Amino acid sequence: MDRKALESVAKHYPYLHLQGLYAIPAGLSWFLVGLSNLQRQPVKPLVLGAGALVGLGVFGVVALYYRNHFGSPTPTRSRQVRQYVALALGFAVFVGVDQLARTLLGRPPGQPVSSYAASWAVGMLVFYAIVGGLRTYHVVIWGSLFVAGVLPIWGLSVDRDAVASFPIGVATMASGIFDHYFLVRAFQSSKRQSLEHTNAGA
């Protein structure tokens, strides 16, 4: 299938937001956020810089992979709008839930829970629900993070939010890998249907 035909299929394909391998550098970014915010055992800037370079390198490899396998399509305007709305509402829910929890539990929360992790999980569920629909693995992964966030296992350390960045990073990468798997399977099916339609009209 040539590049133009590939991009024609991808342009109208509804799951391009599931280019989940981008979640690998995103997850690495969460690790860097956590490391950079540790107060009791701060990480040296050199380590953070090296981590950032690794993340950029991985991002470049992922971008090259998707360009070679899916082309460089421009999503339809309606799909772009939906993605922007999903991002905005997901982030707004994260901030709102986190601030509500801190208002009720104190700043920082007086209970050994992580409102940060739990709120981010809720925001991601909202994002996926809007942008393309929740799938079982979304509910399992982000639901598990939410449950972990509300369990009294976090202690009362000043590094609580920084530590929460690590499971958020793991959940991000896990969700992304499943997204990618779903994307590849469904896109191949869409591509076959497009080829069959083209051959039938020839």
What are these regions (language model features)?
Residues 13, 24-39, 136-150:
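Long, highly hydrophobic alpha-helical transmembrane signal-anchor segments
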Residues 24-105:
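Selected alpha-helical membrane-embedding segments in polytopic membrane proteins
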Residues 8-11, 62-74, 186-198:
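Juxtamembrane membrane-water interface segments of multi-pass membrane proteins
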Residues 9-19, 41-49, 133-144:
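Membrane-interface helix-loop-helix junctions at boundaries between adjacent transmembrane segments
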Residues 47-56, 112-123, 164-176:
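Hydrophobic core segments of alpha-helical transmembrane domains in multi-pass membrane proteins
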Residues 83-149:
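Membrane-proximal helix-loop-helix units in multi-pass membrane proteins
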Residues 128-202:
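Terminal transmembrane helical module of multi-pass membrane proteins
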Residues 1-21, 197-201:
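N-terminal juxtamembrane cytosolic/stromal segments of multi-pass membrane proteins
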